[in-house]
Amino acid sequence: KDIKLQADLDSEKIIHEILTNAFSYPILSEESYKISDEEKKGIYWIVDPLDGSLNFSQNIPLCCISIALYENNKPLSGVIYDFNRDEMFSGIVGVGAWLNDKKIIPSDNIKDKSQAILATGFSSYMNYDKDGLMEFISNIQEFKKIRLLGSAALSLAYVACGRIDAYYEKDIAIWDVAAGIAILESLGNITYSFFQNELKCLIRVENKLKEKNDIRAN
């Protein structure tokens, strides 16, 4: 199961106060705040106050804060802040994406999967029986190298800026990936498939890879 820390709650409280003082939009957050389907038809925030809680608890510097703005289940903008490296990844759909104050320019380099680096993870919701594991392996085995960062948000940020070539994870919560999806959408030419069913999501992202394959929802 996901680890929950006092730091998650403290971060969430601060973010909630800042957002509610500045805006009237409802907030969907991992720890405490849920919204209705009707509210999701309008503009709303999706917040993960501390993505990579286990890393944080073990002093592994792969964790971040993730905040996204959505309207009718579609991304408008997103911010991922890596407080260990003081790196702010941000994106506005239709405008562009940035790493701190530098605009992210997607690479034109097209790679075969056999030469690409994939980030992935083992979700708390994932089916770990034989069939579930075989499906997982079938989706990652073509890649040259596999990395498990322990933070879905940072994994997507790294795809956006070209540090990693692709990301795949099944049965992951929307707040883990919402800001990353917004940043990818802001870049425009990164292919991703995203399917949402309540709190469980299936996401695959590829940055300039050959032989792209869509993953269809079951």
Question: Could you tell me what each predicted segment is?
Answer:
Residues 1-50:
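N-terminal subdomain of lithium-sensitive/metallo-dependent phosphomonoesterases centered on the IMPase/IPPase/PAP
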Residues 8, 19, 53, 82, ...:
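Residue-level signal for inorganic ion chemistry
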Residues 9, 31, 49-52, 83, ...:
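Generic detector of well-ordered alpha-helical packing
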Residues 37-39, 90, 109-113:
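Solvent-exposed alpha-helices and their adjacent loops that cap or buttress functional pockets
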Residues 39-98:
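DPxDG-like acidic metal-binding loop motif
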Residues 76, 104-107:
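Short, isolated positions in well-ordered beta-strands
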Residues 99-103:
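A structural micro-motif at secondary-structure boundaries
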Residues 106-218:
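An extended, acidic
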